[in-house]
Amino acid sequence: MIPDVSQALSWLEAHPDALNGIGRGIERETLRVRPDGYLATTAHPTSLGAALTHKWITTDFAEALLEFITPVDRDIDRLLAFLRDIHRHTARELGEERMWPMSMPCRVERDGDIELAQYGSSNIGQMKTLYRQGLKNRYGALMQVISGVHYNFSLPLSFWQAWAGVNDAESGKEAISAGYLRLIRNYYRFGWVIPYLFGASPAICSSFLQGKESKLPFEHGDNGMLSLPYATSLRLSDLGYTNKSQSSLGIAFNNLPDYISGLKAAIKTPSEEFAAMGVKDKNGDWLQLNTNVLQIENELYAPIRPKRVTRSGEAPSDALQRGGIEYIEVRSLDINPFSPIGVDADQVRFLDLFLIWCALADAPDMDSAELACTRKNWNRVILEGRKPGQTIGIGCGKTERPLVDVGKALFRDLLRVAKTLDSQGGECQYQEVCERLAASFDDPDLTYSARFLRTLQDNGIEKTGMALAEQYRAQLREEPLQVLTEQRFHDEAQRSRQSQSEIEESDTLSLEAFLQGKS
């Protein structure tokens, strides 16, 4: 049903200090909205600094889509306090605008109302906007303003030294990369537990469909709300950001050279569909960066990514080739609407436990057929995860087991990991999280999606969203900073603006020549 990890867990219990120093970082996206709930049409506030170069506050797809980024931290409370400080400062700088507190956008009239993020006049700034122009023309802008939380996670070198026998990060990079790919394969097989527990997009505003038909059997509620009774995360469904043309790429996670070559091939693979669109329109305005399946590597849709911090101008795959996998990025978390900062400590601790389990459990190689099979399990959980009697396919559909049984078996293992982690700090926080979340398998009404759906059914999406946005705005604006200071925010905003100016002044090539050099 799940891999037998008893030996690995016994090893972990004998080496508890191997987990000292887990690295964590969080990226949280949120839309700026006006007091009437519509998407803000204002520019990114200059008081927040330059989105191109700011270390903590930037934008994602749209000018109104804020993205907050924490540095790597080894302390969960400090990590979340840092993220909350970014929210506190931003709430004070946004005037009357609010931060939308859920993943799915609501009051957007048309795709054309969504302004692409702007990054100034430098070649790299214009390239970032052109890439977004390509995303808009390929998939539609509305899909791109769905918000999520990304969790960055790295195991300490001490873990790899004890577990894989490496001496240091450089000489051991192949073993470390293989270890992270093992984690990723297990994540594809069992990561559906994340939307089961934490999915928080069981409903959408009907305006999100923009008049298009959907194959999903939505229930029509008041105020134009569409929902599925047992859904967990419509954000992760085909309504959200998935790329049909990518399904044939066959990017594998069995070893790093194959993963890198698959990624590099994807940005060179031509697409008939995108070629028909053209690179420029008849007026000579850019429509997309190129006509390949992926314009750049970041366009690859994935619920989890192997990562390494890139050097200036370096592609993600080149960074991986240079130094191996440094950390992984989990991309399956919906915005947590119950938290002013979109994520909470229970979620962070659960992800620690689950990702450690994924690193320890055996993970046979995965071919493209099995990768497609894992997607079926995810889809079941995304659309009908709380359905009574729901099953999960084990071993590419060879057997079906009740989701509840698989979840409980997993949590029995996670409790052992929790005890090991707690033994280091003399606390019970990980075990308490385990016990709280394990109850969601006996009672699906405890899941985030069930709790949130009840609220949405009572009050509708718009009313709920605006009430939470106003509540969190008032709360955050009043709270003092914990980790950062207003002076540090001021200095970083100033530094980012100066840095953008320097980049703009140092350009020597035309945009055309610059893009030619990138292809």
Curated annotation (Swiss-Prot):
Keywords: ATP-binding, Glutathione biosynthesis, Ligase, Nucleotide-binding. HAMAP family: Glu_cys_ligase. The gene is gshA. GO terms for cellular component: cytosol. The keyword NADP does not apply. Its EC number is 6.3.2.2. Belongs to the glutamate--cysteine ligase type 1 family. Type 1 subfamily. Pathway: Sulfur metabolism; glutathione biosynthesis; glutathione from L-cysteine and L-glutamate: step 1/2. This is Glutamate--cysteine ligase. GO terms for biological process: glutathione biosynthetic process. It catalyses: L-cysteine + L-glutamate + ATP = gamma-L-glutamyl-L-cysteine + ADP + phosphate + H(+). GO terms for molecular function: ATP binding; glutamate-cysteine ligase activity; metal ion binding. It holds the Pfam family Glu_cys_ligase.
